[in-house]
């Protein structure tokens, strides 16, 4: 059997188009594997790609071979077993494969094809048909962190920072400046000596005087040092304020009796999006999970999403706990503070004004951005309208949106985190 397979080597990134075509061809397999990986992974475990397995029967390469179809009339000389007109059965095909049983001595099989997709490709399939905003990281004033940058040339510095090229250039210029007149005089004397030797070879007195002058000028030139401390040039490095690269994300979720499991799942997917955005913009991220009903508690991720604890609804308990944690562990001059709150909007009516006061006076002045998503198909209640007043006071750092179904998550996320033009 003859096979024709393209195995030509490709330079760096020259097979990108082929890889993209391959990903499009097996998009259903890859998307299914990514969905399974997302359900299996932790919210913070999005740092790598994923291994994708595709059944061997789906990835057969196009080949040229002798087909086994059709009928032929052939004369076989010396045949003693068959007569004209009889049909010869086809030889059986290979019986390779996998599964329990005894080993065979013939046939061929093919394992599943396994390949790795990158983190970028993983996120592309995870957020298919979506476009995460490219946000510019905000600089923090009063930061205590700095980075060292080049700031030109200095005449003083550490020997390890010497600029050899600039030093030699300076030394060459100094030597020319200090010995330029002597070199010009030396050239004139040498020309005169050459003329005398050519035209008046018997004039020994003048020739000796010129030779003595040449020695004197050469000695003067040689006394100019090749390198002087004045010539030394150093790379100047200065400290430049560097924005803090640490961020903390507070995830606040209502787990009262009115929050169904479907509502919690929508909240989880929103929190994953927010976490990935922060991870791409900051070197260090802390995630603080706060669950609340009538009271609030800081919990781990497992309990945050899967605990069955429930009760009434007092949203202010979560905001008070968040403010306490900020004061104890996350000073605003060192940390970029973000918050995402998810709720179905149900709250004790007398508590909604308290939530507004806590946010305006104790939280909003210290956070980079605060988002509130209300997951409900119903009309808004008192909490939403109190938060609207906060949005008016902090239009640049507070945003609220409504989610009705999982299909609303990504459009709402883009709306909340779209790039804003700075004027």
UniProtKB/Swiss-Prot annotation:
Pfam families per record: DUF444
Instruction: Point to the regions of Gly residues compositional bias.
Output: 92-107
Q: Which InterPro entries match?
A: UPF0229, vWFA_dom_sf
Stretches the record annotates as Disordered: 83-108
Q: Which domain of life is it from?
A: Bacteria
Name the protein family: Belongs to the UPF0229 family.
Which protein, by its recorded name, is this? UPF0229 protein Pfl01_5140
Which source organism? Pseudomonas fluorescens (strain Pf0-1)
Lineage of source species? Bacteria, Pseudomonadati, Pseudomonadota, Gammaproteobacteria, Pseudomonadales
